[in-house]
Amino acid sequence: MTTPTAIRRLDAADPDFARHLDHLLSWESVSDDSVNQRVLDIIKAVRERGDAALVEFTQKFDGLQVASMADLILPRERLELALTRITPGQREALEKAAERVRSYHEKQKQDSWSYTEADGTVLGQKVTPLDRAGLYVPGGKASYPSSVLMNAIPAKVAGVTEVVMVVPTPRGEINELVLAAACIAGVDRVFTIGGAQAVAALAYGTESVPKVDKVVGPGNIYVATAKRHVFGQVGIDMIAGPSEILVVCDGQTDPDWIAMDLFSQAEHDEDAQAILVSPDAEFLDKVAASITRLLPTMERAAIVETSINGRGALIKVADMAQAIEVANRIAPEHLELSVADPEAWLPQIRHAGAIFMGRHTSEALGDYCAGPNHVLPTSGTARFSSPLGVYDFQKRSSIIYCSPQGASELGKTASVLARGESLSGHARSAEYRITDPDWTAGNKEDGK
């Protein structure tokens, strides 16, 4: 007999619901002192010894015998070879996904703009791509080619000159799909290094690894901690927490569909979070039964069970309006609106990384091939953060061109404000350009 699921049940009508929800959502992401110190030691070694440190750490952590950095560089020809080593079906899927991701992200491109004022002053904004971006890809047989597409393609669409990928190959394990994805996405250089040492190499550069402007991509606690420490030296995408899915359902979707949607995130790792919110108590019972029945069929059943029972929940609400309130409170990475009329509720959704509309739009489609990016804010950071996109690989510069007349008029305002802040150098710099003799005579000060 199958043991019923032990997934947590919450009711928004409970006076202690807010406290229980806060406890459900809590997750400690801060590295412990030992991890922090190890990462700092690794970063220091890479900064001081460059390639030699990378070779040493690769031998130590990845179990590889390499003589030099030359053994840790994959040429373009090796990426092209990977395309021939995957199945035709896999290549077709990668190419189709890449095409859709590229098409979606093309629409995110920002253009420079300017306008001219009556006196000839020109104001504007110049959009410039980063020179070089670093992409971290987890290694081994469990690595994810979809992450290569989602990180590299927006960078190339943005116009980044060079995309540098690092991917460890523990015990020599190479994922041909990852290399094929890198080839299709247009990755320029690949180094088979990983961990905190790879992040340090990208941030500071070595004899072989070029210094980049931004580091993106997922990784373990050492990678995440290293990204925290190098932030400021380089930009980073985000410090991602465990994967999350929140399903809001009106009770009319097939319970098996919902259970499997919850599993789709729970199978990532034991800390992943899968939550269902519905006003239909009977439907919640049906989904619980589906979870119990389907769980033994999962390849990663142990991981799914730990995640579902440890951090998952079925939440009963009074109505759909309250379901949306709960969704906004959670600010999930992935939000499925599995309802009859998702468009009606969309305007009320304020906080979510990605919103999946309707019963047929499973989160898995967005993970792989719908087009929008699957690198999304987690741990409630959707309240102030956005999905990875082209804009993460572009920067903006303000453009100011003052005509003589414009400089004279703006100088008057700048002078008053600068002297109000007791910054006479600022004031006099502006005043030198004022051509109005009446203003100059009336505002002459000692030392001017």
Curated annotation (Swiss-Prot):
Residues the record marks as active site: 333-334
Residues the record lists as binding Zn(2+): 265, 268, 367, 426
Record bears the keyword Oxidoreductase: yes
One GO biological process term: L-histidine biosynthetic process
Reaction(s) the record says it catalyses: L-histidinol + 2 NAD(+) + H2O = L-histidine + 2 NADH + 3 H(+)
Origin: domain of life: Bacteria
Binding positions for substrate per the UniProt entry: 243, 265, 268, 334, 367, 421, 426
GO CC, alphabetical: cytosol
Cofactor binding note from Swiss-Prot or TrEMBL: Binds 1 zinc ion per subunit.
Listed name of the protein: Histidinol dehydrogenase
Species of the source: Pseudomonas syringae pv. syringae (strain B728a)
